[in-house]
Amino acid sequence: ILRTGSVIDVFNELLTQFNISSIYAHEETGNKWTYDRDINVKNWCKENNISLIEHPTNGIVRNLKNRDDWSKIRNLRMKENLIPKPISLVPIEGIKVGSIPKKDSPIFKNDFTGKVQKGGRDEALKIIKSFIDDRSKNYLFNISKPGISEKTCSRISPHLTWGTISSKEIIKLLNLKKNNSLQNNKKVYNKNLNAIKSRLSWRCHFIQKLETQPSIEFSCMHPFYNELRKDDMNLEFYKAWKEGLTGYPFIDACMRSLNYNGWITFRMRAMLVSFASYDLWLDWRKTGHH
């Protein structure tokens, strides 16, 4: 069932057609827009006496009092059994299925950048299998090489974002492979698998920061730095940076690769932002949207 539009408008329309007692969802950490949307949905549910049940996703802990116990909570969550999929789903009579928007729909605004990965559950399983079975053997060796890393990195991030696979599921697959590995160089192979487990933890760590302190989308983590840069933007530097024309060969090569493919390894992405912030002295709140 698919609907597009304001979530409150969609729920109001459904409420006129069906008796809604509960809404089940996963806990999402997005940006200020999704945060405000979630607040509006919670208020709407209260007004209409509807239960809103949200399930944790990956290693993000909602309403965390402090960070001291985060790692312990996350690791325990990753060890839990996978929730089995339902044997069957009872369809709701009379509900319209809705249509999937086409890629040229106005709701997407700008054209897609680079090469868009295929979506779907089957594709997620295919990608993680090819990584664990073969591509991971050179993961750490190639992680800082922008061109080669396109093939030896996991490439599973979009599927984690859209929920076609979970961190818990990947970790269990990694552990299973480590225990049953028949690789010739098992020590190196397992080191690579441990490295991707570490990256999965870091992914949760960074998202947890945004969950706990959503203001960092717009403000520096340390308030002292908020006024460090002037309000005016050096548009000449910004244009050169985003087009890969700074004159720094490695920086420009990485940016051009990013613009063409729509993806670059996390390490190179961090380098591009660091170069913009420290060498070009550009405000991260502007460059972060590129």
PLM region spans:
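Helix-loop-helix junctions that connect adjacent transmembrane helices in secondary transporters/permeases
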Residues: 215-250
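Glycine/tryptophan-enriched, flexible segments
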Residues: 48-50, 69-224
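Alpha-helical scaffolds flanking conserved acidic
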Residues: 190-197, 267-271, 286
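Short conserved catalytic/interaction loops centered on acidic-Pro-aromatic/His motifs
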Residues: 35, 54, 264, 281-290
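Contiguous, well-ordered alpha-helical segments that form the cores/surfaces of helical PPI scaffolds
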Residues: 157, 236, 240, 249-259, ...
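Active/binding-pocket-proximal capping segment
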Residues: 217, 223-229, 270-290
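An acidic- and aromatic-residue-enriched active-site/binding cleft used to recognize and process polar
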Residues: 5, 28-30, 55-60, 164-165, ...
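Trp/Phe/Arg-rich N-terminal binding region typifying the photolyase-homology
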Residues: 1-87, 182, 256
